A protein has these predicted regions:
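Extreme N-terminal basic, low-complexity initiation segments
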Residues: 2-6
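Core subunits and conserved enzymes of cellular information-processing
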Residues: 9, 14-244
Length: 244
């Protein structure tokens, strides 16, 4: 005997045998795809970008002065600069400028683009280093070993944080940092590894050319990369690679 569905005054359906009738099949909604995290860059307010760029470049200049005044060893790029100066007899400023231009040529295959931050890098840092050295020479005319160690280590940390700050503003990296970000983008290697490889390579070339070398140079070469990597978590929400 077939079950026939009959209506109920209470608003639900039953069959002639008293069993509840099967409800109409419900159409299941298609699952909504969850957004992929990290698929789009995190936007940074333009004011913050400008302030972060400026503070990062000022900090970079101060950190450079701290390393130079420490007497414990020059930074890797400074070792290379000094080596070329010793071999060629050219003025230090011209060597720095020439290396910067050569490094920017390497941007072409890496598809890096200069920006306002690239120009600001050259201007601001050069304007900050000399006044910072003037202040340090008056506060610590001849730093003893403990003070020199503090300046070298503090300069390494400050330079790493400052690098993450002005590169993270994504207004255009400096010549040397553009090389770093370009290699990170092309190789997929972490920032700390690319930064360390670059610094070690530059140190070796500088020493071979006769540049000054010290323990602080080694600490800087191996330590600044991890500092940049950690600081970038807060100062570079969109990452250190790519374009604005």
């Amino acid at each position: 005997m077939e079950d026939k569905a009959i209506g109920s005054q209470h608003g639900y359906m039953t069959t002639t045998t008293g069993r509840p009738a099967d409800s109409a099949p419900r159409s299941e909604a298609a699952p909504v795809a969850s957004p992929v995290r990290g698929s789009a860059p995190i936007l940074m307010h333009p004011v913050r970008r400008g302030v972060q760029l400026l503070l990062g470049l000022v900090g970079f200049g101060v950190a450079t002065a701290m390393m130079l005044h420490s007497g414990q060893g020059a930074m890797p790029w400074a070792v290379l600069d000094q080596g070329i100066v010793d071999r060629t007899g050219l003025a230090y400023g011209w060597v720095v400028l020439g290396i910067g231009l050569l490094v920017m040529l390497a941007w072409i295959p890496l598809r890096q683009r200069p920006g306002i931050g690239t120009v600001a890098n050259i201007i601001v840092i050069s304007l900050v280093i000399d006044p910072a050295l003037w202040v340090l020479e008056r506060l610590l005319p001849a730093p003893a070993l403990p003070a020199g160690i503090g300046l070298a280590l503090g300069g390494t940390v400050l330079l790493g944080v400052s690098t993450a700050a002005y590169v993270g503003a994504r207004l255009g990296p400096g010549p040397r940092d553009g090389l770093m970000t370009g290699l990170v983008h092309r190789t997929g290697w972490p920032v700390w590894l690319v930064k360390t490889v670059i610094e070690v390579t530059v140190v070796v070339l500088g020493v071979l050319l006769g540049g000054t070398f010290g323990w602080a140079t080694v600490v800087f070469a191996f330590g600044v990369g991890p500092v940049v990597q950690v600081a970038a978590r807060w100062l570079a929400p969109s990452g250190l690679t790519g374009h604005p």
